[in-house]
Amino acid sequence: TKVDAAIAKANVLNKDNYKDFSGVEAAVNAIVRDKNITEQSEVDAMAKTIEDAINALVYKDADYTKVDEAIAKANALNKDNYKDFSAVEAAVNAVVRGKNITEQSEVDAMAKAIEDAITALVYKDADYTKVDEAIAKVNALKKDNYKDFSGVEAAVNAVKRDKNVTEQSEVDAMAKAIEDAITA
């Protein structure tokens, strides 16, 4: 019967996916069996009530918590520290709001895209201008004119060229060490 078909349709639905499933449950619970053929219009109305309740269901919203956390992480970064921040910006800009729970995998993919873009970021190199200027001063000196030039040479040899922008203070300290060794 139409009522049984409507009940079967309601039973296959996952009520956890909907904002309010009570209308469907109420319609199913309101079924009165043992009607005779003269009461067919009432039976048809029961089936229609269930169908209408199913059609009125609204999916719950997708959970954007991971997306929001990834966006917050991206926003906390100083984009000027990275060689190319555009992939992160593109992933954040690609977020589409308003998805429902049946589209959760798409929402999760948006969060993953942002996280992956953040993971792929590469820091800019540190600025070695001051170090290079200090070394140029050293190269202009005649080391034979000094009693002990080893401190200057040690300071120059201590320079490491693999620092990134977050380690700028270490690079600046290398330049200062060379300058201090020259004045000593």
Regions found by a protein language model. Name each.
Residues T1-A184:
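Beta-rich interaction/scaffold domains
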